[in-house]
């Protein structure tokens, strides 16, 4: 996966959706940060579902500050690879990772998607606000918000 890839996630009875917020490569190390949206649904999500979803984030100066994260090493993410399907790619507005949450299972992703808004003092924005442009196999679109 590459930064900006939009991924549908297959849980047992429903789907979620996330994007790769960063890929960190170093000597003998490859790690992925996945930013999860609040979307859970029965059908496989589309890029339009992703754009219509909400994400935990705020503003930090002129950048968006993501408040959702699942931080996987290459080995752990590789064991779940059959649960992910790339459905598109996004170019994002400037952002920083405001949270780093180690993850190794599908439950870790599900827990990020369903974090309690009040307990964790989360604010949500329309995912579309963070997107400069997106592409699928069928089309490339610059977001006019």
Please identify what each model-predicted range represents.
Residues 1-11:
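Short coil-to-beta transition motif at edge beta-strands of beta-rich domains
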Residues 3-4, 15, 31:
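Short, surface-exposed beta-edge/turn micro-motifs
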Residues 7-9, 20, 34:
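Hydrophobic beta-strand residues in large extracellular and virion-surface proteins
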Residues 14-24:
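Short beta-strand-centered aromatic/proline hotspots
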Residues 22-48:
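Basic/aromatic-rich interaction segments and small domains that mediate binding to polyanionic partners
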Residues 50-144:
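Beta-strand-rich cores of mature extracytoplasmic or soluble domains
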């Amino acid at each position: 996966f590459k930064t900006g890839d939009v991924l549908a996630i297959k849980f047992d009875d429903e789907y979620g959706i996330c994007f790769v917020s960063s890929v960190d490569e170093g000597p003998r190390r490859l790690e992925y940060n996945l930013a999860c949206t609040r979307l859970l649904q029965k059908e496989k999500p589309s890029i339009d579902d992703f754009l219509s979803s909400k994400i935990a984030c705020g503003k930090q100066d002129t950048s968006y500050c993501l408040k959702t994260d699942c931080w996987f090493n290459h080995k752990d993410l590789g064991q779940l690879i059959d649960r992910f399907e790339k459905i598109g790619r996004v170019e994002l507005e400037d952002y920083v990772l405001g949270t780093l949450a180690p993850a190794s299972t599908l439950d870790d992703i599900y827990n990020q998607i369903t974090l309690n808004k009040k307990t964790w003092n989360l604010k949500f924005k329309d995912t579309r606000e963070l997107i400069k442009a997106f592409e699928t196999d069928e089309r490339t679109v610059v977001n006019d918000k």
